[in-house]
């Protein structure tokens, strides 16, 4: 099926937009020297899939993915006690975009690096937001950029199930 001309023009307009018109503001961040458990708690409270990581001087150290933290938190508690957020970041420098860059540039960068989200830096080099693949798709669909404050987001579903009831008669003993 051939694409209609107005659809093609819309796509070109979206790709030519600057990132700041499509991204969402960074409402929640995590310090690079925080523990992995603190990062997990922030993910749970915010309901986000990505957390920007900032260094003590305010520079962006990268973007933490919820799945990476979930894998790390599956480790024994002893191993978790010394695990820092910065340890969870991938070994290379952060993949970032700047507010004045185009959506096309960001989409190309995300495709080449295999990421589904990137931190967005302002003109001063400080973190101003996060751009996700969902944000780009929403822009193509004509939806406005999302600006959900953390307190208006639906609560994240609980990740821990209640413990199973005790077994009765296990190995010849009964639970009172």
Give the residues covered by each predicted segment.
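Short hydrophobic/aromatic beta-strand element in the GNAT-like acyltransferase core
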Residues: 50, 60, 117
């Amino acid at each position: 099926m051939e694409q209609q001309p107005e659809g093609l023009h819309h796509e070109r307009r979206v790709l030519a937009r600057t990132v700041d018109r499509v991204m969402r503001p960074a409402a929640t961040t995590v310090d690079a020297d925080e523990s992995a458990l603190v990062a997990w708690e922030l993910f749970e409270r915010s309901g986000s899939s990505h957390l920007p990581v900032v260094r003590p001087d305010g520079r962006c150290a990268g973007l933490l993915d919820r799945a990476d933290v979930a894998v790390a938190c599956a480790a024994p508690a002893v191993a978790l006690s010394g695990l820092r957020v910065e340890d969870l970041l991938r070994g290379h420098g952060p993949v970032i975009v700047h507010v004045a860059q185009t959506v096309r540039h960001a989409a190309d960068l995300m495709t080449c690096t295999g990421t589904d989200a990137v931190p967005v830096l302002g003109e001063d080099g400080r973190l101003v937001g996060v751009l996700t693949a969902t944000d780009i798709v929403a822009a193509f669909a004509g939806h406005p950029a999302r600006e959900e404050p953390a307190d208006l987001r639906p609560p994240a579903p609980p990740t821990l199930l209640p413990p199973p009831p005790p077994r009765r008669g296990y190995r010849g003993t009964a639970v009172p």
